[in-house]
Structures are given as C-alpha cells and as structure tokens.
Regions:
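Alpha-helical subdomain
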Residues: 2-84, 99, 185-350
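Conserved Class I S-adenosyl-L-methionine-dependent methyltransferase catalytic core
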Residues: 10-14, 21-43, 47-53, 61-62, ...
C-alpha cells in the first residue's frame, strides 16, 4: 500500500490543494482588523462619511488625521468590506456598508459604537493569555470580583444598545401575557425587564445583580420611565436569596461566566422561587452538542480563562440538563441569535 493510501484524507495533499500558512496568518493578524475597525469608530470615520465628508481629504480634515493616514485607514476599511469606493482615483468618494451605516454612525438610533469598543481594554490581558492559562488566579466572579460603579457604568454604556435589541427580540419571541412578576438574574442595565414590562401590561420585574450594577440599572430604569414597573435587588445571585412567588425567571448573557455546579445551583434556586406553572428562560452563548462550535460561545468560554473565573462554555444539551435536573418540564432549546445566543426554556409543573 502506498504512503498516500495510508495517510488520512485530511492530510493528503495534491498540487491543487497544497497546504500553506494563509489561514494561520490571517488568524495571527486578525487583531490588525480589530484595530482598524476600532480606530474608525473612535475617530468617527463612518459618521463623517455619512455626513458627506466622503473623500480622503474630507475624512482627514473632519476627523483630525493626516491625508496619508486617512488613505491608509480608508484603504484597509474598503478591503475589509466596511466601506465601498467609487473608483481607484485619489479623490474617489467612499460610502458606508449597510451594516456600518445602521450601527456605526453616531446619530443612528441603533448606534453600537460603544459595543464595538467594549473589548478594547482586554487587549493587554489577551496578550498574556498563555501565561494566564499556565498560572491562573481563580476567582468565582473573575473580572467582576472587584467591579465598581464606574466599571458598571462603562460596561453598560457599551452593552446597553445591544442589550435592548436582545430584550426586544425576547419580548417578541415569548408571550408573557398574564404574568405578574419577573425575576431578571444578572439583569445588568435592566433591558429585559424594561422592555418586557413595557410590552406586557401588568407585568412587574426585579433586576438582581451585583450592588454596583444595580446603582447603574436604576439610572437606566429611570431614563426609560420604568421605575413604577421595575425595581432592583443588590446581591450575588449564587448566594442571595431569591424573592418568592415570581412567575418568570430570566437569566441572560452570563452563562459562560459560571461553572456547571453554579449554574445548577442558580437554576435550582429559580425553580424554588417560581410559582407552579412558572417559567424560566436561560439565554446564553451555548456550544453545539458536538462541541465543535459556534466560535462565539467557544471564545466567551476562553475569555473566562483570561480573567480567572471558574466559568466555561456549556453545550445546549448541558443547559437543558441543568433545567431538567432542577425539575423543569418541557425543556427545549429555541433559536435566538443564530451562532451567538440560544434560549433554553422550561416550566415548573403546575
């Protein structure tokens, strides 16, 4: 038998499919693209273009950089498909890609610039990833162990617009008609509670989160004129007693921050707090059951290694299991944000 016949198919090379380093180089240099995108947001390049300052010279003057650097940045943004250009001429006009126009122009009601910049402060820590994996300093809450009010304010300034979008999606996906009290675990800015109580008359909500976060949550609740519907409870939901008699529990976008034992603990507490017939919705970054992806969930799990929590990525089947073990029935995985978030829900028997 020839060597080629013995080799695994994935390792067999032909002249047409010869292995090279292109894929690996692209990964190694991916932070260059991140830096270009973040610089464009910080400099308000996309906003300048949307307002008609759409040539290299006009962008340079508007955002306060040299024409040479404007040319460098705009060329990269075109290659990244964030911008289009009319022609190859030096005085070509540029235009924003549709998603850029919607989410990265400052006067858009869906402006997500702070979310794009959300992970920038983590760059230095990721540069130390191998060392942090070798010598972890483990804390249950990881990066949130020493969270301050100012940390919470910066965090939710970055995540609020995305959180409100997810909250609107939740309230479109789930019928909470007739429900009276929702417990929002790790509810952050209160987005899910604000939108749900606005959507479903008669529903009130409690946002349970760390003490510094609830200070900031109150600011968002007041800004949305929801203080008569949404209150806060300061605490750590792995330790703090839950209010009883709730008929909806939501835990959203904090799944990878916790290890299985803590998720089981929290889900068990939620089950005990719910009235018979009540429901729980756990929304998070979940792995497929074959553990091959999606990448987003895998990276959020890795992120916990960077910041020293005990959390990791969970599969959809594992999350279903946490609810079923607690006693929930009819547990099912529902699509939420494909490739990013799943919604796992179940009901307490009546």
């Amino acid at each position: 038998m020839s060597d080629a016949a013995q080799a695994p198919a994935s390792l067999t090379m032909t002249a047409k499919s010869r292995l090279d380093t292109t894929r690996l180089q692209k990964m190694a240099q991916a932070y260059w693209e991140s830096a270009a995108l973040m610089a464009a947001v910080e400099l308000e390049v996309f906003t300048a273009i949307a307002r008609g300052h759409d040539t290299t010279a006009a962008v340079a003057k508007t955002v306060g950089i040299s024409e040479r650097n404007a040319e460098r940045l705009l060329t990269a943004l075109v290659a990244m498909a964030l911008l289009t250009r009319e022609s190859a001429s030096k005085d070509s006009r540029f235009a924003n890609a549709p998603d850029v126009q919607r989410f990265l122009v400052k006067d858009s009601d869906r402006y997500a610039g702070p979310w794009i910049l959300f992970t920038k402060p983590r760059w230095a820590a990721y540069g130390e990833l191998s060392e942090r994996l070798r010598n972890p300093v483990v804390k249950k809450l990881g990066a949130y162990d020493q969270f301050t009010i100012e940390d919470a304010r910066r965090y939710h300034a970055a995540t609020y617009s995305i959180g409100m979008g997810a909250a609107r999606l939740f309230s479109r996906s789930v019928d909470l008609s007739g429900r009276k009290l929702m417990l929002d675990l790790g509810g952050g800015s209160g987005a899910y509670s604000i939108v749900a109580t606005q959507t479903f008359p008669g529903l009130k909500a409690i946002v349970l989160d760390l003490p510094p976060v609830t200070v900031v949550a109150k600011e968002y609740i007041e800004a949305n004129k929801a203080s008569d519907r949404v209150t806060t409870l300061a605490g750590d939901f792995t330790v703090t007693d839950f209010p009883q008699g709730v008929d909806v529990v939501v835990m959203a976008s904090n799944l990878p921050q916790y290890e299985p034992a803590l998720i089981r603990l929290v889900v068990g507490k939620a089950f005990a707090a719910l009235v018979p017939g009540g429901e729980m919705h756990l929304i998070g970054e979940t792995l497929n059951d074959d553990r091959r992806g999606p990448l987003s969930a895998a990276l959020w799990g890795l992120n916990e290694g960077v910041f020293g929590s005990t959390g990791l990525a969970h599969t959809e089947a594992e999350v279903k299991g946490y609810l079923e073990e607690a006693g929930f029935r009819g547990v099912a995985v529902h699509p939420f944000v494909p490739g990013v978030l799943s919604r796992v829900a179940g009901r307490k028997p009546a």
